[in-house]
Each structure stands twice: as C-alpha cells, then as structure tokens.
Design a protein with these regions (language model features):
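Active-site recognition of the HExxH zinc-binding catalytic motif
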Residues: 84-96
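Metalloprotease/metallohydrolase-associated module, dominated by Zn2+-dependent proteases
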Residues: 2-80, 99-179
Length: 179
C-alpha cells in the first residue's frame, strides 16, 4: 500500500503546462527587454516560479528580483496572463528598481504599465476563481448570508475580530449546521 498518491497528471497536461511556463518566461524576457530599450536601462531577467496558490494571479518579490505566478489560474487564463498579468508584475520590479519603495499601484507603476507596456493599469484580475476558492463558512446578519474564508472564520472563533455587515451594520454570526 503506497504512503502517498500522486495526482493524475497526463503527459499531455504536463506538456501543456511546460509550454505555458515557456510562454510566460518568454513574455517576461520580452517585457524586460522592452523596458530596457524604452527606459535606457539594463535590468536582468528575474527568477520565475509557478507556485502561488489561492486567488492571487501573480506576485513580484522586489528585493529578490523574482516573479511568482499561480499555475491554476495560468492554465485557465493563458492569454490574459501573457497580456495582462506578466506586464503587471514586471512593472512592479521596474518601478522598484527605478524609484525604490513607492505605492504598489501608484502613479509610477501606472506610468510604466501604460507608457512602457501599453497595457491598461488594472490593479486586480477578473478571472473566474471558483477552481481556486477555498472552503468558506456561512455567516448570517439581518439582511444576508455572507461567506467568510477559513482564515477569517478562525479569527472569529478565537475572538480576535468580529465582522459586521456593510449594509445593515449588524454583527456576522456563524450558525453551524447540525449533522
């Protein structure tokens, strides 16, 4: 009896992910090269990882000169990743290198997005996140049922925080369902 089981990954899906990783890596290189040409700089290509989980599409680790991407959202939205997420994250690195610590989506970042990469500077993605959404707990108020994440639910249970409804301003209460 095996101690663990491997996920069912087909050769075709592995090849598809390798192709997507290659496309992302190539797009990152193109963005860096374009920024170097446009801004007369010599930025090196960042390290790239595909290990983010949850709802986050991408992340720039500024001091490490590293980009991280969500492989699930990438597989579900490859074209949008290449056209929007990669320039978004590369812009964070460029802004950090040129201006230091500034507001993450401030005027410097917006300028790099629009003037260097010719991409609309959106701060969030609009991908369907059903496949990466975690478990939620139904909390009730006087006007609605509001799902809270595991993290927020645990904070409520430890009495570290109490959430209130934005509409009716009443406290959110968890009513566990009976078995």
């Amino acid at each position: 009896m095996p101690l663990f089981t491997l996920p069912a990954v087909t050769i075709q899906s592995a090849k598809a992910m390798n192709e997507l990783h290659y496309r992302i890596t190539r797009r990152v290189s193109e963005c860096i090269s374009h920024a170097n040409l446009t801004l007369n700089t010599e930025f090196s290509a960042p390290a790239i990882r595909f290990d983010i989980r949850g709802k986050t599409a991408g992340m720039a680790l500024l001091q490490r000169w590293q980009l991280r991407f969500n492989p699930v959202l990438l597989a579900e939205n490859p074209d949008a990743f290449i056209e929007e997420v990669v320039p978004h994250e590369v812009s964070h690195l460029i802004v950090f290198a040129r201006f230091g610590r500034v507001r993450p989506h401030g005027k410097e970042w917006q300028s790099v997005m629009s003037q260097v990469f010719d991409v609309q500077p959106k701060t969030t993605h609009s991908f369907d996140i059903k496949s990466v959404e975690g478990k939620t707990f139904p909390y009730h108020c006087e006007c609605d049922v509001i799902p809270l994440s595991v993290r927020r639910h645990n904070k409520v249970q430890r009495q570290q925080v109490q959430y209130v409804c934005r509409r009716c301003k009443q406290p959110l209460v968890w009513k566990p369902s009976s078995p």
